Amino acid sequence: MAKVGKRLKAAHEGIDREAFYDLPQAVHLIRERATAKFDESIEVAMNLGVDPRHADQMVRGVVELPHGTGKTMRVAVFAKGAKAEEAKAAGADLVGADELAADIQNGTIDFDRCIATPDMMGVVGRLGKVLGPRGLMPNPKLGTVTMDVATAVKAAKAGQVQFRVEKSGIVHAGVGRASFTEEKLVDNVRAFVDAINKAKPTGAKGTYLKKVSLSSTMGPGLKVNLGTISGAA
């Protein structure tokens, strides 16, 4: 515990928690302080001026980060026949129909993304109480209910990120790893923020993008100067 406390103290040294840092500087400081024995995830959190309890203020979508997330994604696909073979060829980890649904009902959820062809939604729909709370329910708006399963699988494997605003008005996501170069992390953060801006709902009033913070898994959080993020408004 002493070593952990010493490392955390060192990570916070030289950090002004109240200051707003330019994006490149924030990335540099966060990455510099990601000293855990594993490859820490770099996370972005955004405070939005929305109330997601209202349907016209929901923020939800997907974004393909230019350099991926650094996370190995396991993908499950509900499909039959030729579409099942297409999913397997694209690199899906789990492909099936009723038998896959049975495994999930029994508590076996060994995947990070779930995709389904439209004809399989009758089967998948029965899994709503299991997949829904985990954010795994296939959704046509997110491109995970589709006949083009190959493209969906490849996008998930390449680091496509799904986002959804929480009740508190915060949306967050992993945008890379500490092992990424600073340039790649900056690119990914800007791509994510740009996607959130493009997903601005019609019912949003006042300031939409209120605050952006950056952190690593075990490190301090830093507030980012919005003016240094391309597309931030």
UniProtKB/Swiss-Prot annotation:
Cellular component terms (Gene Ontology): cytosolic large ribosomal subunit
Cysteine pairs bridged by disulfides in the record: none
Classification via InterPro entries: Ribosom_uL1_bac-type, Ribosomal_uL1, Ribosomal_uL1-like, Ribosomal_uL1/biogenesis, Ribosomal_uL1_3-a/b-sand, Ribosomal_uL1_CS
Gene3D superfamilies the UniProt entry points to: 3.30.190.20, 3.40.50.790
Function: Binds directly to 23S rRNA. The L1 stalk is quite mobile in the ribosome, and is involved in E site tRNA release. Protein L1 is also a translational repressor protein, it controls the translation of the L11 operon by binding to its mRNA.
Family, as annotated: Belongs to the universal ribosomal protein uL1 family.
PANTHER family: 54S RIBOSOMAL PROTEIN L1, MITOCHONDRIAL, LARGE RIBOSOMAL SUBUNIT PROTEIN UL1M
Subunit structure: Part of the 50S ribosomal subunit.
This protein's name: Large ribosomal subunit protein uL1
